[in-house]
Regions:
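Generic short beta-strand segments
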Residues: 120-127
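A short, structured loop/turn motif at beta-sheet edges
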Residues: 108-116, 132, 144-150
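Bacterial N-terminal signal peptides
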Residues: 10-21
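A solvent-exposed, acidic/Ser-Thr-rich amphipathic alpha-helical stretch
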Residues: 39-43, 60-114, 121, 134-136
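Bacterial N-terminal signal peptides that target proteins for export
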Residues: 1-11
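Acidic surface patches and DE-rich sequence motifs
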Residues: 76, 128, 146
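Short beta-strand edge/turn micro-motifs at domain boundaries
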Residues: 24-28, 137-162
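Short, low-complexity N-terminal intrinsically disordered segments enriched in polar/charged residues
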Residues: 23-70
């Protein structure tokens, strides 16, 4: 009886799973847009990410305010999670003098007209407030969403490589 009961649960589980799998729409794929659209989106997002990397040198918070969505969730390598306001405060309070800010091994995946995921490596170098030189490398993944014709970052996570 116990074996039959377990078998019955297994059959029911498989049947329900099969039924539900037909109810779930597949996730967006790169085929959701034409190759031309994907290329245009890739160029736009890449340009914005490159500009973002340069704000380490310029501390252009006006630019960051424009590309960081109000609902931004930014997870730092140490596990701290910042919203937009906290991330801006972190930039404004940073006393490092950055001399180099470079993105490499950068890839964009377009999943629709309004959605892209980016990943890459980021290397920043300079001097801290005490004049000591630093060189930091990170790997990041970011989520860009287009709202009202404007691309913005809604999530970003990075981990320190060195």
């Amino acid at each position: 009886w116990v074996v039959m009961k377990q078998l019955g649960f297994l059959v029911m589980f498989v049947a329900v799973g099969t039924m539900l799998s037909g109810c779930v729409s597949p996730g967006p794929t790169q085929s959701a847009v034409s190759a031309e659209e994907a290329e245009k989106i890739t160029e736009e997002v890449t340009k914005l990410d490159q500009q973002w990397s340069q704000t380490a040198l310029t501390k252009d918070t006006a630019f960051l305010k424009s590309i960081w969505a109000d609902d931004l969730r930014f997870t730092q390598p140490d596990g701290k999670v910042f919203d937009k306001e906290a991330a801006l405060a972190d930039v404004e309070g940073n006393t490092d003098t950055v001399t180099s800010s470079v993105i490499s091994d950068y890839k964009v995946r377009v999943y629709g007209k309004n959605f892209a995921v980016v990943a890459g490596d980021y290397h920043v170098a300079g001097k801290d407030k005490d004049g000591r030189t630093f060189s930091r490398k990170f790997r990041f993944t970011g989520v860009w969403v287009q709202r009202n014709g404007k691309w913005q970052v809604v999530a970003e996570q990075s981990e320190k490589l060195e």
